[in-house]
Amino acid sequence: MSTAEPAPDPTNPSTSGLAPTTNGIGSPPPTASAATKFSILTKFLRRKNQVHTTTAQQNEFMQKYMPNGNSNAVQPAATGGQPASSDGGSAIEVPPPKESYAVRIRKYLANYTQDPSTDNFYYWTCVVTVAYIYNLLFVIARQVFNDLIGPSSQSLCRFYNGTLNSTTQVECTYNMLTNMKEMPTYSQYPDLGWSKYWHFRMLWVFFDLLMDCVYLIDTFLNYRMGYMDQGLVVREAEKVTKAYWQSKQYRIDGISLIPLDYILGWPIPYINWRGLPILRLNRLIRYKRVRNCLERTETRSSMPNAFRVVVVVWYIVIIIHWNACLYFWISEWIGLGTDAWVYGHLNKQSLPDDITDTLLRRYVYSFYWSTLILTTIGEVPSPVRNIEYAFVTLDLMCGVLIFATIVGNVGSMISNMSAARTEFQNKMDGIKQYMELRKVSKQLEIRVIKWFDYLWTNKQSLSDQQVLKVLPDKLQAEIAMQVHFETLRKVRIFQDCEAGLLAELVLKLQLQVFSPGDFICKKGDIGREMYIVKRGRLQVVDDDGKKVFVTLQEGSVFGELSILNIAGSKNGNRRTANVRSVGYTDLFVLSKTDLWNALREYPDARKLLLAKGREILKKDNLLDENAPEEQKTVEEIAEHLNNAVKVLQTRMARLIVEHSSTEGKLMKRIEMLEKHLSRYKALARRQKTMHGVSIDGGDISTDGVDERVRPPRLRQTKTIDLPTGTESESLLK
């Protein structure tokens, strides 16, 4: 219900009928409206992430800042719609505040799932592989080679009495650390060496944290990784997470993320100058992601065999690296420079007198020693202690097994890389032997060999059918469409054809290579193919081959009219010119048989092609207009006869079956009639015997026979109606 409007107050310009105008003469200056002020307040509150402004807050704002009191106070609508003001107008609609970035990110991550087949995920696996390689290389190296911890560690703990073993190293470290008063920081170190060490140690900590962050992100992606189910990628968050907890991947991810190096590698109250990088070994169990990256890279690579060789070489380097670190660790555990086998000044092969002992020298010699041992060359100093003998023996055994496997894999990969060349060479050798056996001229033999060389040089030793036959028909059609579709569009008669026919024809195109001087066709030959020039040049010459009429370049088409079998063509299906190859020429060939086999399924396209062919011949004045528009080819006639023979054979087989069935039915009827006839004869004989008449017509004596004997009853038999002529015909049918 509408309420009565209040009486206008002359003292209140907002309610009186004489409200001042905004554009009249002598009108008061314009003031900011309530809507403007309220919108400013709303924006301010929204920026401060305040809650929604209620109707009560709006009224309070109006009463406090508006000079007219609460005459324009906003009241809630009675019908539950938009809030209405006192004058019947609608209140200002406050839009909901925008969500913060944290809320958006939380919602996005709650519904996020990863498709494992995307390119972005492949790039991410490459990042995880880099993090894995970092741990694989430096976990053992930082544990063994102390100088990797910082540039000052070598100057802090030097050789003590010519040697540096584990005991003197611990004492040196303890003496340096006990001189520190508090937890060391960058500014509290007593010398520049310690400050450099601290800075270098923080660099390793930074890289460790960075690689651990990569592992954390990869764990989340594994948690939301989609999976294949019935040929489709399942990406529902609930199903994906359930599949993750049911798999073994979550155990691997959890073990690889245990921060043992952070828990046990930072003693308190001082920092261990060496640390415990070996506690990061649990990061190395995440090898599955690296294997997936290598497999997908091999699949994507255009040179998969070369990539396999690189991977095998990398495996060899990793094995040698770890073995080198183990050698130096044993040398350090025994004592550097204590005998001629370990690293030190007594081992003249490792540290001659004129060579300075540096980190690079230590690692290079250890890597060299490991390479010689694992390759079973063995030109290294002989071991002295029992543990040295045991380590060398174990290394030699592992080297024989590992490198025998690696060499076998490398040999198989190299043989696979040369498999195509070997197959091609075998074909060429067979042709050479055949030509030598058949006494082929030397000039022709040279041409054949040059043709083979051209095929191998231009990588055309394999045909398209051999390469693509492993793919399904759909993928073969898509590849052929991308390779040959535009080429086929250049043919005049195919320009307006439907895409389905062109998709059929691109699969029929075959590549042929012609040598210099070869005639593709000669005048008067029967045309069975059309040609499209892919590469090279062709010349149209006279019968002598001396005069050149025209030169055909790449993309030219000829012979298309001869395979259409157009009725009324004055040339018939004969070639009208001599076409010769100038150099090596690659041609796409489409045969007449393949074209007409494809046109059977496209009758409209067939009519269109024939109409275009007639127009072209008519334009060149090579068409007999009185001839029928369509003429059957010999193949079509033969096919029609074959179809007629098949129809006759089918009808004959059906008639034979019907005859056999009818004959069987008639034989059954004849047998039944013979049985009934024999029964009638027996009854007739019995009746004649009862009346004293023999079958031969003589009387039979009835003396001594009781006259009251009743004659035997005749057995009721079924009457048999012989079929009429119409019924017999229907029966035969």
From Swiss-Prot:
Main location: membrane
Pfam families: CLZ, cNMP_binding, Ion_trans
Biased composition (Polar residues): 12-25
Any GO molecular function: cGMP binding
Span list, region C-linker: 419-496
Tissue occurrence: Expressed at the sensory endings of thermosensory, gustatory, and olfactory neurons.
Region (Selectivity filter): 376-379
GO biological process: aerotaxis; calcium-mediated signaling; chemosensory behavior; chemotaxis; detection of carbon dioxide; detection of chemical stimulus involved in sensory perception; G protein-coupled receptor signaling pathway coupled to cGMP nucleotide second messenger; monoatomic cation transmembrane transport
Residues where Na(+) binds: E379
Topology relative to the membrane: Multi-pass membrane protein
Outcome of mutating D429A: Fails to produce currents in the presence of 100 uM intracellular cGMP
Reactions catalysed, as given in the entry: Ca(2+)(in) = Ca(2+)(out); Na(+)(in) = Na(+)(out); K(+)(in) = K(+)(out)
Extracellular membrane side: 149-197, 266-276, 332-362
InterPro entries: CLZ_dom, CNG_cation_channel, cNMP-bd_CS, cNMP-bd_dom, cNMP-bd_dom_sf, Ion_trans_dom, K_chnl_volt-dep_EAG/ELK/ERG, RmlC-like_jellyroll
UniProt region (Cyclic nucleotide-binding domain), positions on chain: 493-607
One GO CC term, this protein: cation channel complex
Transmembrane spans: 126-148, 198-217, 252-265, 277-287, 309-331, 363-385, 386-411
Region span, Disordered: 1-33, 67-95, 694-733
Subcellular compartments: Cell membrane; Cell projection, Cilium
Binding residues for 3',5'-cyclic GMP: G559, S562, R575, T576, K619, D620
Protein family: Belongs to the cyclic nucleotide-gated cation channel (TC 1.A.1.5) family.
Function: Pore-forming subunit of the cyclic nucleotide-gated channel. Required for normal thermosensation and chemosensation sensory behavior. Required, downstream of receptor-type guanylate cyclase gcy-9, for CO2-mediated responses in BAG neurons. Required, downstream of receptor-type guanylate cyclase gcy-14, for alkaline pH-mediated responses in ASE-left (ASEL) neurons. Involved in the development of ASJ sensory neuron axon during late larval stages and in the maintenance of normal axon morphology in the adult. Regulates dauer formation.
Record's protein name: Cyclic nucleotide-gated channel
Lineage: Eukaryota, Metazoa, Ecdysozoa, Nematoda, Chromadorea
Gene transcribed to yield this protein: tax-4
